[in-house]
């Protein structure tokens, strides 16, 4: 008897309020990284699909931009309530597609919802300013307006939170939006789009086109897309920034990271170990705010390494849907193999392997265990490169200043953390570290939605960051009106 073939569902693009098939004949499998099960197929869409979506967005923008700001805000409040209603379903979709455990997925959903809540404050955010007397009988006012059709290119590692940095604010401020999500996590995006429609967002205001290079290039080249928001790797981010800038678009490109954490002798050791283990190994290290390097003062180093090793070895690895699991898989086989190659490179270059994640590789999914290196130096590949996996390097230092100097040598400058009870050390750290987001006695210094996600150096290309007031400026343009009203006689 022959084998039974189970047909896998093909995901569609979301354009002008409808799910429609892509014009492509090329599809890619979407795989549950914990089980290697094919859960659907995603289209590698074409520039023609981008063109269709942009036309729909452009048409919708003409009406949506004229909708009263409080009305747009109420729709965003509706959306927030629907996301709250379906939080558990959203979290499960994230775990199935991405692999992170359910607790982390629920946290991501909550951060996405918080971004929607911030965007729902559009009436306050869009307010301009004025000066009633700049000369005799002359006043001036500054107004904000949406910029048009904008595009977002999002990664696989935060399939809800990162898109929610982008489209809720953009559409709340009156723009129309085209999202290219990661082709590895399409099901979560389907749910986000359906809930937007349920919330009352008109057809064409929000559109989704799945794909790879052709879709990205179609967005970067299209003259009717006025701005591009990107989150992803450094090489792709550089390309997006250059290409979009050449085509005279606004661009914000949030790229790679190599986040350093400094642990001083006076730190609460157990607290530091718990937070650093979560920051380094949570989400399988696949996040731009992961702790990648720890510089620890010599007086506490032996105890720190021993406790961190024990903590890493105690972490439960497995399918994120299962109770008690902390560490899920990396996203794909090639990511696992790339991580193994970095571990081998670290050993080859002379680092000491304290905890070897290769010993916990599983055939069931794309799993690799927590990995810790000691005796790492700044000329080693594992210190320089963004590995994007549960791999942590430890360097012993004499003092805070040496730890800061090491961190500042990195080409990346997304985040940095300090564990200490010394307020003077905190101030010195804040004033001398080259990084855009700092954490004191915490492992992941990602800010709330109302502050900018403010990476420095090769972690960000652009002027206006995602989130906070920067995002309002990014998605709006200003119009200044100077008016003269000659004073009549009221005598």
Curated annotation (Swiss-Prot):
Keyword Iron applies? no
Q: Which GO terms describe its molecular function?
A: malonate-semialdehyde dehydrogenase (acetylating) activity; methylmalonate-semialdehyde dehydrogenase (acylating, NAD) activity
- Indicate the residues that form the catalytic site: 288 (nucleophile)
User: Where does this protein hold NAD(+)?
Assistant: 154, 156, 180, 183-184, 233, 255, 386
PROSITE patterns membership: ALDEHYDE_DEHYDR_CYS
EC identifiers of the protein: 1.2.1.27
* Annotated pathway: Polyol metabolism; myo-inositol degradation into acetyl-CoA; acetyl-CoA from myo-inositol: step 7/7
Q: Does this UniProt record's set of keywords contain rRNA-binding?
A: no
Give the reactions, separated by semicolons, that this protein catalyses.
3-oxopropanoate + NAD(+) + CoA + H2O = hydrogencarbonate + acetyl-CoA + NADH + H(+); 2-methyl-3-oxopropanoate + NAD(+) + CoA + H2O = propanoyl-CoA + hydrogencarbonate + NADH + H(+)
The protein's matches in InterPro entries, at most eight in alphabetical order, are given as:
Ald_DH/histidinol_DH, Ald_DH_C, Ald_DH_CS_CYS, Ald_DH_N, Aldehyde_DH_dom, MeMal-semiAld_DH, MSDH_GmP_bac
> Biological process (GO) annotations?
inositol catabolic process; thymine catabolic process; valine catabolic process
Which UniProt key words apply to this protein? NAD, Oxidoreductase
Q: What does this protein do?
A: Catalyzes the oxidation of malonate semialdehyde (MSA) and methylmalonate semialdehyde (MMSA) into acetyl-CoA and propanoyl-CoA, respectively. Is involved in a myo-inositol catabolic pathway. Bicarbonate, and not CO2, is the end-product of the enzymatic reaction.
Family note? Belongs to the aldehyde dehydrogenase family. IolA subfamily.
Q: Kindly state the subunit structure of this protein.
A: Homotetramer.
HAMAP family reported in the protein's UniProt record? IolA
Name of the protein in its database record: Malonate-semialdehyde dehydrogenase 1
**Gene name linked to the record:** iolA1
